[in-house]
Amino acid sequence: RQHALIDEDTLAGTLELRYVQTGDRFQPFGMNHGTKLVSDYLTDRKVSLFDKQKQLVAIDTTTQKIVWLVGREIDNHYRITQSTKRILRITCQ
C-alpha cells in the first residue's frame, strides 16, 4: 500500500517523511481508544528488525503526530468519515 487516503481537514500543518523513532506512538485505523507503540504494531505483524529500522512515517509537522505508517496503516484520527469534506491522497514511491 504505497498510498493513503486521509481527511485533509484533520491536518494541522504540512506532511513530512522521516524514519520511525524509538517511542513513536499512533492509533491504528479502527482502534478507537488509546495508542500503540509503532514498534509493537510492527512486531505484531511479524516485520523484521531490518524492515522496522527503515520504516517511514508521514507526520503532521504542527502536531508531530504520525499520520501514516508508509505502506502499512493510517492513524485513526485522520481516517475518512461520513463528515469528511476533502480527501487527501498521499503517495510514496
Per-segment meaning from a language model:
Residues 1-93:
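Basic, glycine-rich polyanion-binding accessory segments appended to enzymes
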